């Protein structure tokens, strides 16, 4: 894989930092759950991203104060956001697509291990198919090489 993935009009160097991620995704604190893009293979429709899990995450105040655990639904959301970066890069013209993507379906979600403060969550997403404005993905989240969660995720794009 090349260190410089390309889109129609943009050349990107890996890793892709948070500034570029914010240009591609509408999410902001406290709901931006992707910190860095480590790998991008547009031919294989695959992206690998990173989420640094910190004790400073607002959800740890209530989930659970005595035993902080990242909520599984936020792990799935982080996977979807990684897929969103890949989709925006594949569709973009001059670095931004006119579509805004929403998660519309999650199937076969599995949570194998808790994600806790200090973990580095690696988000591996592959687009399985695209039908008009719908994208179907498979994602795995890993910590230290071990799959902690996986799911099939469907997103729909609407004009922004």
From Swiss-Prot:
| SUPFAM superfamilies named in the record | Thioesterase/thiol ester dehydrase-isomerase
Which residue windows are coiled coil? none
E.C. no? 4.2.1.59
Q: Does the keyword Lipid biosynthesis apply?
A: yes
Q: Which residues form the active site?
A: 63
Question: One biological process GO term for this chain?
Answer: lipid A biosynthetic process
Under the heading Pfam families, the entry gives: FabA
Q: Does the keyword Lipid biosynthesis apply?
A: yes
Which top EC class is given? lyase
What subcellular locations does the record give? Cytoplasm
Domain of life of the organism in this record? Bacteria
Q: Which UniProt keywords apply?
A: Cytoplasm, Lipid A biosynthesis, Lipid biosynthesis, Lipid metabolism, Lyase
Among InterPro entries, the record links this protein to: FabA_FabZ (IPR013114), FabZ (IPR010084), HotDog_dom_sf (IPR029069)
Gene Ontology MF term list? (3R)-hydroxyacyl-[acyl-carrier-protein] dehydratase activity
Catalytic activity reads: a (3R)-hydroxyacyl-[ACP] = a (2E)-enoyl-[ACP] + H2O
- GO cellular-component term (any): cytoplasm
| The protein's role, per its UniProt record | Involved in unsaturated fatty acids biosynthesis. Catalyzes the dehydration of short chain beta-hydroxyacyl-ACPs and long chain saturated and unsaturated beta-hydroxyacyl-ACPs.
* Protein family membership: Belongs to the thioester dehydratase family. FabZ subfamily.
Q: What is this protein called?
A: 3-hydroxyacyl-[acyl-carrier-protein] dehydratase FabZ
**Origin species:** Xylella fastidiosa (strain 9a5c)
Gene behind the chain: fabZ
């Amino acid at each position: 894989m090349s260190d410089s993935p390309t889109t129609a009009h943009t050349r990107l160097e890996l890793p892709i930092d948070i500034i570029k991620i914010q240009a591609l995704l509408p999410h902001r604190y406290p709901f931006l759950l992707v910190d860095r893009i480590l790998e991008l293979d547009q031919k294989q429709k695959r992206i690998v991203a990173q989420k640094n899990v910190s004790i400073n995450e607002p959800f740890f105040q209530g989930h659970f104060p005595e035993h902080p655990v990242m909520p599984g639904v936020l792990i799935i959301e982080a996977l979807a956001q990684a897929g969103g970066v890949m989709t925006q890069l594949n569709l973009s013209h001059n670095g931004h697509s006119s579509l805004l993507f929403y998660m519309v379906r999650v199937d076969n979600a599995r949570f194998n291990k808790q994600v806790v403060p200090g973990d580095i969550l690696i988000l591996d997403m592959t687009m399985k198919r695209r039908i008009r404005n719908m994208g179907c993905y498979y994602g795995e989240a890993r910590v230290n090489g071990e799959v902690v969660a996986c799911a099939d995720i469907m997103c729909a794009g609407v004009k922004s």
